[in-house]
Amino acid sequence: MIRYIKNIVIAIIISVIGINCTAICINAEAEERRIVYLTFDDGPSFSNTDSILDILCKNDVKATFCIVGSNAASNKGTMRRINNSGMGILPHCNNHDYKKIYNSTESYANDLDECMKTINGIIDEERTYTMVRMPGGSTNTVCSRDVLRNIKAYLKSRDVNYIDWTIDCGDTKKTVVERSVIKENIEEVCGKSVVEVVLMHDLENKKTTTEALQDIINDYKNLGYEFKTIEAMEPWEFDYLISRKIINRE
């Protein structure tokens, strides 16, 4: 009887150790990986978004496009190409007018719903979006603090997350930012985080961003990063970005 109990105890200990070892192995595997999310805001545009898609597809690289509904409505073919190319799609806003969007929580909610409706109508799908990017980011200074706080609570009530970025390529600092400057902005800080989210823009006047894209892709490939869409984010990546206040920053 004593030997029987002893064997059971040993079996339980081995089982527990095995489970813990598995968890450790999974965590170790995650820590060894490096993930980058290339994100493009404010499009799609007439031709620049297509040029970006050409580069992404040529390199077999995935990225995520944060869509302005009114621009999607004006460039339906490009919007469909984004979807058909297997790129990520996040609602950004319907009309990129900060004062109107951030006038109230209701204004933001109505604009976001219209953006989602527009995207789904063009790609002929009924998607449910669980991640968005807020215009100007979740800590923008255009929106009042009270309204911004209420918007975040509203998104939470809908089980919708919001994502910012770890790296800003700086292509909105002026109308046209030199390719070399964009490249340097990325190279100065890339590779410092396990999961990186790069902010870029694909409006028609952001062609220098497109010109720098191949160099940016090369940099991340040389650093051993995987390129993914935000929709393909794994739980450990989500938790990592939460802990670094890139997702759902209060």
Put a short name on every predicted segment.
Residues 96-199, 203-221, 225-226, 232-233, ...:
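Catalytic domains of cell-wall/extracellular-matrix polysaccharide-remodeling enzymes
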Residues 26-134, 219:
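Active-site beta->alpha N-cap acidic-glycine motif
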Residues 1-39, 44-60, 74-80, 179-184, ...:
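N-terminal pre-catalytic segment of deacetylase/amide-hydrolase enzymes
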